Amino acid sequence: MALSVPAAAQAPRSANSAGSAYRINPGDELEILVWGDERLQRSVLVLPDGTFAFPLVGQVQAIGRLPAELERVITAGLQPQYRGPVPQVTVSVKKPSGYQFSVIGKVGSPGTFTPGRYVNALEALAIAGGPTTFANMGSAKIIRKAGDRVFVVPVRLQDALKGDISTLNALPRIESGDTLVIP
């Protein structure tokens, strides 16, 4: 059965979804809109294996992809179901619960955080309430797991806190699962 949607029912591309730098993680809740076909509009949860099911498309591999990439995958999957152009598909991250990191050590509020956007080491420190009085900002580090391996990434937060622009630009981005340690 082929569906037809008039061109007037197609929505313009969302600048927000196309320009988003957020990559999908397991546990994220996505809002998927198929303009002009309300039956296909829904929220989906990305499963622990990094996939979700979508009507007429089947299983979609989402982990590590940008929302704009998922828009293209779903559009391609819907193509055989329509006569004429496929309605505009928009994917947005409704609840980014898959991007979490921890901050431990001498900070105001140590814990695990889900900021809803990517942050660098200095922003992660701010989210955790900033350093306490005796924090050693020159010895901060990120503990990062990649498969079975563990990496330690040194972070020079001391210079960044003093306003050194070159240091601010070089701060590493916190990845999902990272632990920022402030000794």
Region roles according to the model:
Residues M1-S4:
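Bacterial N-terminal signal peptides
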Residues A7-P183:
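Ser/Thr/Pro/Gly-biased, low-complexity, turn-/loop-rich segments
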